[in-house]
Swiss-Prot record:
It comes from Arabidopsis thaliana. One of its GO terms (molecular function) is 4-hydroxy-tetrahydrodipicolinate reductase. Residues 1-51 form a transit peptide. This is 4-hydroxy-tetrahydrodipicolinate reductase 1, chloroplastic. NAD(+) binds at residues 79-84, 171-173, 194-197. InterPro entries: DapB_C, DapB_N, DHDPR_bac, Dihydrodipicolinate_Rdtase_pln, NAD(P)-bd_dom_sf. GO terms for cellular component: chloroplast; chloroplast stroma; cytosol. Keywords: Acetylation, Amino-acid biosynthesis, Chloroplast, Diaminopimelate biosynthesis, Lysine biosynthesis, NAD, NADP, Oxidoreductase, Plastid, Transit peptide.
Length: 347
């Protein structure tokens, strides 16, 4: 089987256009592990394996309404002008969480007002952020900050939250992750840190890490093809895909990360991948295809997400989880989405 990409002429996927991504069935807290891309630093606790998963944005609308009331929790969503920030505000509002009408953004956004769910939120630029955050925290001592900003701001933002002492949920990817954990650990504040807030996707990733640890070398000699499709604005390869590939590498598969086939062209996304046109601007489709050396055995793993509600709902659950830990004065201070799942907060 050809291994130079899923769109190669000899690839089996060309015999199945439009369904390449279609579902066939319609802690270590702290530094990341070394040697491979460990998505969550999950540790050694293991769960059953999940093979395929598809989520649609609108399907979670009713689920988000089932969240327990906010119980006095207030959140400040930094990056509120972005699509994820707005999605989190909508999910939090449905959950009964109080939305503080203040947010941090870029210098160009300073002074802007963003309206979401009938709430007008004032955006503050980089200047006087510490003064503003301290004032908000004093007024709302139950405050939890949610960060959906940009990768280059991750470490500066974490340092700010740590200096003020406000707990936070970090949904922004990138930055120096080791430094991020060190900053929070030194400040001894409460935080949920995760580059992937979709709980079901996190469960799939956990299952992959379980399989990799329990059955190293199980797929030795197999070839791997990986295709991922995201909105055109995402220029880099999926971190989720890299984490799954790392698991396959431990399972004995030889594969370089630069072999990942990135689909960013809207026409290909609709015609070949099968992304609904209404979700071209916001989706995350992943497909992993394994083939035995003699091409008599093949395995497929996939997870497809349309929209952002799966991430927004997971973020709200992380907020509720963290608020509970703060009230209980838990000894552990830094958590990830695996901890949220283990708490039984699946909606």
């Amino acid at each position: 089987m050809a291994t130079n990409g899923l769109m190669a002429s000899s690839s089996v996927f060309l015999h199945r256009p439009r369904i390449a991504f279609a579902s066939r069935t319609n802690q270590t807290v702290g530094k990341y592990g070394k040697g491979r891309v460990s998505f969550m630093g999950i540790g050694t606790r293991r769960l059953p394996v999940v093979l395929s998963m598809t989520a649609m944005a609108d399907s979670g609308e009713e689920a988000v309404k089932s969240v327990l009331p906010g119980n006095g929790i207030s959140i400040m969503v930094n990056g509120c002008s972005g699509k994820m920030g707005k999605a989190v505000i909508k999910a939090a509002d449905s959950a009964g969480v109080n939305i503080v009408p203040i947010s941090f953004g870029s210098a160009g956004e300073d002074g802007q007002r963003v309206e979401v769910c009938g709430k007008e939120i004032t955006v503050h630029g980089p200047t006087e952020r510490e003064k503003v955050l301290s004032s908000v925290f004093e007024k709302h001592p139950e405050l939890i900050v949610v960060d959906y900003t940009i990768p280059s701001a991750v470490n500066d933002n974490a340092e700010l939250y740590s200096k003020v002492g406000v707990p936070f949920v970090m949904g922004t990817t990138g930055g120096d992750r080791n430094k991020l954990y060190e900053t929070v650990e030194e400040a001894k504040i409460y935080a949920v840190i995760s580059p992937q807030m979709g709980k079901q996707v996190v469960a799939f990733l956990a299952a992959m890490e379980i399989m990799a640890e329990q059955f190293p070398g199980a797929f030795s000699g197999y070839s791997l093809d990986v295709m991922e499709s995201h909105q055109a604005s995402k220029l880099d390869a999926s971190g989720t895909a890299k984490a799954v590939i790392s698991c396959f590498q431990e399972l004995g598969v030889s594969y370089d990360m630069d072999q990942i086939q990135l689909i960013r062209d809207p026409k290909q996304q609709v015609e070949m991948v099968g992304v609904p046109e209404e979700h071209i601007s916001g989706h995350a489709f992943h497909l992993y295809h394994l083939t035995s050396p003699d091409e008599t055995v093949s395995f497929e793993f996939q997870h497809n997400v349309c929209g952002r509600s799966i991430y927004a709902e997971g973020t709200v659950d992380a907020v509720l989880f963290l608020a509970k830990k703060i009230r209980l004065k838990a000894d552990q201070r830094i958590y990830n989405m695996i901890d949220v799942l283990r708490e039984g907060n699946m909606r």
